[in-house]
Amino acid sequence: MLPITNHLSCTEPLDEFESLSYHQTLHAKTYITGLAAARSKTCKGIAREVLPANSERALNKFLTEYDWDEKQLNHERLEELQNHGETRWSQDGYIIIDDSVTQRTGEELPGVGRFYDHSEGETVWGQNLVYAFYTDDKTAYPLTFRQYEKRDDEDEDETKYKLAREIITELEDEVGVPADTYLFDAWFAHDSGLIKHVESYGKDWVGPLRSNRQVTYDNEEIRVDALEERIDKTEREVDDDTYKIWTQKRPVSKLGEVKVLIAEKVTDDEDEENPVKYLATNKIDAPSAHVIRTYSYRWRIETFFEDSKQDLGLGDCEVRDGEGASRHWHLQMLTYSLLRL
């Protein structure tokens, strides 16, 4: 592969960022060019393949020693996205909260440990990041993240829920993302404190229920999967798909009275997985089709995780310094965003 002789044109908006000095901007452009176009996304690989890098040491110092604020950089990234119609957020958009585990091999990397990887269905050695992600009909990009670091004296679930609440506070109080609806997976939707935190800002939410979640029906509490065996579903069209649907306003454990929707996709394809979905939302009066369509947007964060790991170096940082690793992940989000402009 021939060396990359110039910074990618998508890095030009960095010239207007106030969080970086002139020389820091050059390093950032080099690093972003490497994340986007180099085969190896480490400092060593970028220095070898991107000629403006000067040296691996210079990039390492940029990540670990130079004085710049990655949080300010991130806010400037989000401000830049609002300058373009195709990436400007709106009330009709959605904020997705989810986490991702990046498998690693080193034992001295920041926050590395054993985490359950939902995409693999097993516990792996790696780093765990909790993300907020914006999406709507025209665009999709990350908003911010927190790294979860496992400690023996802490409850893993509660600590990760706390990080998610911190993210929501930042988005609502500092950034001001106008999206009216939050989307969760079953793990995050299990935390009543997180749900209440979203509702405290007057926002809506949609998330799946675990099959063992307790629902009050006929004056008794039963599992939602047991409820599914009792009820009669009605066949309805949602876009180009057919679902068998049942929905009612019901008390759910930890969530209070919410709209419960049980949906089973109808298909003639024997190879297509056809699980029953148990969804809940505080959008009590929302049509079933709206709830199903809304929740389908959650998949876009999975695409971001996949693209970031395969093509943009999400899991390639070898820096052992915590601040340096955080800066790498912020620059990776910036790379993803600039490539969409």
Question: Residues of each region from the PLM?
Answer:
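Structural motif
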Residues: 19-27, 119-125, 319-329
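Short, amphipathic alpha-helical segments that act as regulatory/interfacial helices
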Residues: 29-33, 129, 331-339
